[in-house]
Amino acid sequence: MQKYLEKANVLIEALPYIRKFNSKIILIKYGGSAMENEELKHCVMQDIALLKLVGLKPIIVHGGGKDISAMCEKLGVKSEFKNGLRVSDKATTEVASMVLNHINKNLVHSLQNLGVKAIGLCGKDGALLECVKKDENLAFVGTIQKVNSKILEELLEKDFLPIITPIGMDENFNTYNINADDAACSIAKALRAEKLAFLTDTAGLYEDFNDKNSLISKISLEQAKILAPKIEGGMHVKLKSCIDACENGVKKVHILDGRVKHSLLLEFFTDEGIGTLVG
């Protein structure tokens, strides 16, 4: 009997959060180990399906960095990084597009199997993500200038769950690889999302990354700005995206450990939460 009471308590604890976030847009940046481990992948898909089925409006922006690197190596295409961003010449961009579109279709299939009306989109579809070149040294890496959010709003209105590949184009129809964190942030801002959640391979933000006891469970926008210059690599890019989002209409940003099963549900629907809350 005790285990049934515990299950009931879990549902009761979740109820006020389900009510609070009903019909709210939740932007989820999906990447890291949660994409690579089949068991974790299934847990994430279950979480997102549940979010959708209890009345939230999730949107997924996915990465695929390790798969892109593996395919580049397999095809003999040189791949390098600068300041946490992949340098993308035409060959690398073509590989990235191919790999990301393959991942996208698999995610659509997974969610459809869970009863969700999922739809896959590339950022070039309907000029969803309009870009300019980010930096000459990064070649075809784009900075988003405009998100044509009307496309996403109409899909949400029709009960679809959009899954977005972070590939965009410029006014001359050149294809650009976009950092998935940047894409998620830009889309969340354009839609003024209730939440933006990053699934990562760390437990969250640390005051000192070498000290695992320095995990930050909650940080204000001003504190995040102070911490950002002290962080390097991919997490620096992620924290900059968090700050940008909070300054531009996104209410809360979450950095979650995608290696923990059901981390999305634990963060959104429990009192304690998990990971780092920014904002």
UniProtKB/Swiss-Prot annotation:
InterPro entries: AceGlu_kinase-like_sf, AcgluKinase_fam, ArgB, Asp/Glu/Uridylate_kinase, Glu/AcGlu_kinase, NAGK-C. Coiled coil: none annotated. Keywords: Amino-acid biosynthesis, Arginine biosynthesis, ATP-binding, Cytoplasm, Kinase, Nucleotide-binding, Transferase. Disulfide bonds: none annotated. One of its GO terms (cellular component) is cytoplasm. It comes from the Bacteria. Gene3D superfamilies: Acetylglutamate kinase-like. The keyword DNA-binding does not apply. Substrate binds at residues 64-65, 86, 177. The record marks 29, 238 as: Transition state stabilizer. It is found in: Cytoplasm. It catalyses: N-acetyl-L-glutamate + ATP = N-acetyl-L-glutamyl 5-phosphate + ADP. The keyword Ligase does not apply. Pfam families: AA_kinase (PF00696). Its EC number is 2.7.2.8. GO terms for molecular function: acetylglutamate kinase activity; ATP binding. Its main location: cytoplasm. Pathway: Amino-acid biosynthesis; L-arginine biosynthesis; N(2)-acetyl-L-ornithine from L-glutamate: step 2/4. One of its GO terms (biological process) is arginine biosynthetic process via ornithine. PANTHER family: N-ACETYLGLUTAMATE SYNTHASE, N-ACETYLGLUTAMATE SYNTHASE, MITOCHONDRIAL. Belongs to the acetylglutamate kinase family. ArgB subfamily. Catalyzes the ATP-dependent phosphorylation of N-acetyl-L-glutamate. This is Acetylglutamate kinase. It comes from Campylobacter jejuni subsp. jejuni serotype O:6 (strain 81116 / NCTC 11828). The gene is argB.
